[in-house]
C-alpha cells in the first residue's frame, strides 16, 4: 500500500472492530488508548479482550458480523480469522465510504496502522510495505536513539512555542526558532544541552 502518512486526532472517533482474537485485541487497545469510542462485533472474545471490555466499558455485539453493523462507524477494522468475512466487511466499508484497516489483506483496506514510537510530544510511525514485523524491528532501532531525552527536550520546546504564541509573538517565534532547530539540533538534545538553550533563550 502506498499512501500519505497523517496523524489523526482519535479522541471521540467512532471505531468498529470486527473480530475477537489477538489482532482485534491489539487494534482495540490502540484505539481505546487514543481516546476512540470502540465497538466490537464477534461471536467470542479472547480473555485479554474481555478484560479490556470490562475495564473500558466497550460496547460488544456477541455474534457474527452483519452488514448493518457498520452503522455510524467512521473507521472499521476487519480482524476476523475468516477471509470471506473480512472481504465482505471491506466491500461494506467501501460502499459506505468508510476508512478500513484489513488486518489479513492490507490491499483490501484504505489505511494501514504503523509501528509507533512515542516519547512525549514526539511520535514516529514506521511502515514497511505490508511487513509488520519489519516495521516493528525498525521502530525498535529508532526507539533506542530517540529516547526520553527527546521527549523531555521537545516538551520544553513546545512549551516555549505556546508561551510565545500566547504572548502574541508568533512572528518572533518564526524568525528566531531556527536558531534552536538548527543543524546541531539532535546533537544538542543528545548532549542534554537543548533544554538549557531554551531556558536561556531571549
Give residue spans per PLM region.
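An accessory alpha-helical subdomain
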Residues: 129-202
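ADP-ribose/adenylate-binding Rossmann-like module
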Residues: 75-81, 86-112
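Short loop/edge segments at beta-strand edges and connector loops
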Residues: 42, 60-64, 104
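Short beta-strand and adjoining strand-loop segment in the mid-core
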Residues: 35-39, 73-83, 121-130, 144
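Alpha-helix C-terminal capping/helix-to-coil transition sites in glycosyltransferase folds
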Residues: 12, 71-73
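Glycine-rich, highly charged phosphate/nucleotide-binding loops
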Residues: 51-71
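E1/E1-like adenylate-forming module used to activate ubiquitin-like modifiers
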Residues: 99-151
Amino acid at each position: 500500500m502506498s499512501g500519505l502518512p497523517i496523524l489523526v486526532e482519535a479522541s471521540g472517533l467512532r471505531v468498529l472492530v470486527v473480530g475477537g482474537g489477538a489482532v482485534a485485541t491489539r487494534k482495540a487497545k490502540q484505539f481505546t488508548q487514543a481516546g476512540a469510542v470502540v465497538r466490537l462485533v464477534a461471536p467470542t472474545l479472547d480473555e485479554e479482550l474481555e478484560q479490556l471490555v470490562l475495564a473500558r466499558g466497550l460496547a460488544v455485539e456477541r455474534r457474527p458480523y452483519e452488514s448493518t453493523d457498520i452503522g455510524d462507524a467512521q473507521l472499521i477494522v476487519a480482524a476476523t480469522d475468516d477471509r470471506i468475512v473480512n472481504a465482505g466487511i471491506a466491500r461494506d466499508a467501501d460502499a459506505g465510504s468508510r476508512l478500513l484497516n484489513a488486518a489479513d489483506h492490507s490491499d483490501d483496506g484504505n489505511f494501514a496502522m504503523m509501528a509507533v514510537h512515542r516519547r512525549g510530544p514526539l511520535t514516529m510511525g514506521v511502515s514497511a510495505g505490508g511487513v509488520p514485523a519489519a516495521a516493528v524491528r525498525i521502530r525498535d532501532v529508532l526507539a533506542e536513539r530517540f529516547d526520553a531525552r527527546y521527549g523531555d527536550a521537545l516538551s520544553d520546546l513546545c512549551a516555549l512555542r505556546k508561551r510565545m504564541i500566547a504572548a502574541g509573538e508568533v512572528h518572533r517565534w518564526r524568525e528566531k526558532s531556527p536558531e534552536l532547530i538548527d543543524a546541531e539540533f539532535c546533537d544538542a538534545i543528545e548532549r542534554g544541552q537543548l533544554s538549557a538553550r531554551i531556558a536561556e533563550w531571549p
